[in-house]
Regions:
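Conserved glycine-rich cofactor-binding loop
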Residues: 14, 19-23
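A glycine/serine/threonine-rich, flexible loop-to-helix segment
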Residues: 3-6, 54, 108-109, 193-218, ...
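Short C-terminal tail/terminal secondary-structure segment
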Residues: 2-7, 159, 234, 245-260
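Substrate-binding pocket helix/loop in short-chain dehydrogenase/reductase
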Residues: 105-111, 115-120, 214
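Short, small/polar-rich loop/turn modules that mediate ligand/substrate recognition or access, typified
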Residues: 186-190, 244-246
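Residue(s) in the substrate-gating loop at a strand-loop-helix junction
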Residues: 154
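Active-site helix of classical SDR
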Residues: 134, 170, 178
């Protein structure tokens, strides 16, 4: 009989992750590798990718490769997929964590800081990256039948948080895209959202999040730690969620259900 814990293992599977840096992406990449997956991590910053890759390979026997990409550019995503296949073969898991287009309304700019350029970046990175990676990996997933695409959602996709309007609209559209892909790509590929709240923000982001009272507006009344999204990311990646698709798993401290 298969152990319950074995359903969470990812041995021999290959995972592509975007937006990997200090925070949720790094923790998820390390968790997938620890559970047996080959991981291909990507972000815009080569320096942080080198550090994370070295740490994974030192611990997990050389199952990580890094690729510097802009998730909003199709040609970069094509290169990411090609690199993953060249190193590890067919792709099983896509974890879409890259995000862009967040406007904080500095210096009184407010909603009009959502320029055409901001709108384009938000839609390209937050929405189209999921669509493009689904298209680019669907042949692999259709063949082996164990595909899992996970897109990181935001509380901003459920309720308006001005002035981050372009970001919120792109995340709301992502919800519909994920449900549509889940129906279209079943049964060989499952597609789900992971809604992540304010996870240990730092620097300017922390100041803004505190100013908005985001920690106080969720049920648990604190910011999350970056590793608190890992359990849900593991669940959605493998056989433990084999009957789950078109869904959203929430790791946001109860904020979506309680926000004013």
């Amino acid at each position: 009989m298969t152990s319950v814990l074995d359903r969470f293992r990812l041995d021999g599977r290959t995972a592509i992750l975007t937006g990997v840096g200090p925070g949720v992406g790094e923790h998820v990449a390390k968790a997938y590798a620890e559970l047996g997956a080959n991981v291909v991590i990507s972000a815009r910053s080569a320096d942080r990718l080198e550090r994370i890759t070295a740490e994974i390979n030192a611990r997990n026997g050389g199952r990580a490769v890094a690729v510097t990409v802009d998730a909003g550019r199709r040609e970069d995503l094509e290169r990411l997929v090609e690199t993953a296949r060249d190193n590890f073969g067919p792709i099983h898991i896509v974890f879409n964590n890259a995000a862009a287009g967040i406007v904080y309304g500095k210096d009184g700019g407010g909603i009009w800081d959502n320029t055409d350029a901001v709108w384009k970046e938000a839609l390209d990175v937050n929405l189209m990256a999921t669509w493009r990676l689904a298209e680019l990996t669907t042949a692999d997933m259709q063949q082996h039948g164990k595909g899992s695409i996970i897109s990181v959602e935001s509380c901003g996709g459920f309720t308006p948080i001005p002035p981050a309007i372009a970001y919120g609209v792109s995340k709301a559209a992502l919800l519909f895209a994920v449900r549509s892909l889940a129906k279209a790509l079943a049964p060989h590929t499952r597609v789900n959202c992971l809604c992540v709240g304010s996870m240990s923000p730092d620097g300017q982001e922390a100041e803004i999040h505190r100013g908005l009272g985001l920690a106080e507006r969720n049920a648990i009344k604190r910011f999350g730690a970056a590793d608190e999204a890992v359990g849900a990311a593991i669940l959605l990646a493998g056989d433990a969620s084999s009957y789950t698709t078109g869904s959203t798993v929430f790791t946001e401290g109860g904020r979506v259900g309680t926000i004013a």
